Amino acid sequence: MKFLKYSATLFMAGILTIGLSTQALAQSDNYSKAVAAFNKALEQAKANEFESAINMYNQAVSLAEESDNEKAGDLVDRAQSQLPSIYFQLAVTKYKAFQQSQNIAGLEEAMTAFQEAADISEEYGNGQVAQKASNIVTQLLYTRSIIEFKSQQYDAAIASLDEAIERNPNYAKAYYQKGLVIKNQNDEDLDIALEMFDKAIEVGKQVNDNQIVRQATEAGRDNLIYRGVQNMEDKNFARAEEQLNRALEYDAESANAHYRLAELHNKQTNWDQAISHAQKALDLETGGKTELAKIYFELGTALKAQGRKAEACSAFKNAAFGSFQSPAEHEIEFELECESST
């Protein structure tokens, strides 16, 4: 019986030894497979096979984590450190594909890929790639809004811009674009659009985005001048004056705004103000004879009304060009009977 017990003990010890040896071999085999997977991933990444490389790096991590090899932890770290840049490069290829297709579906794929790159980079402690990828997602939201705007999907465009602004409140360009979308969506929402232009100017100055500051300033000015002229033609003079003066708040050196104010004041027989704005417009105008002619005509009109014949004649002579030539000559010859310069 003692022999049988001893034999049984030896048998069980043998099974345990064999089991431990098999486990050790399996762990050693896992590490070897992890190394092979890592090397394969490197080759695939060099060949721009980024999706395959990602899968292989993840496989290397899984295998290494199942191994007790003293080098397994280092292999896990090395594989995970490669993933942020590989995810980012994959996202870049998605973006290049979008550049070829220029459709929303391709753009969405690129955005998703860059967001994945940002998330993976954050998870594995690569803050630089995480920030870069996240910033690109914000820029692509702006790009999406442009596509939506051009296809008159105004609500979708505003939603994209709101998301971009939420991600980056200092994104001056997004405020400017939102103003354009709102203005085009409903022409009656000019005041709301102007709020966006004002915000774009404010943020643009803070981040030194001079191009957006200029564009938003011009948009505010030009839209107010356009609306002011419409109200002037509708004889809504008080509203027109308010809008034209507000245009000057955007651009105090706008020759066009001063010209339109001269025209407006002439219609209301405010001769002194008409002359003042016409003279400012002449000082600021950088265009040629065509642009100057219309200003001189308004100046001549106000001077004539004040009985300042010689000055009015001089103004109308300068106005006698292009589409203003005939009405200016009529004033010179028949209304004022100006002396001939010959």
Identify the function of each model-found stretch.
Residues 46, 89, 96-97, 143, ...:
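Register position in tetratricopeptide repeats
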Residues 210-215, 222, 226-238, 298-342:
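Terminal, low-structured helical/coil segments at or just beyond the last alpha-helical repeat
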Residues 75-78, 82, 89, 129, ...:
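Canonical tetratricopeptide repeat
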Residues 20-100, 104, 108, 112, ...:
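N-terminal leader/linker segments that initiate helical-solenoid repeat arrays
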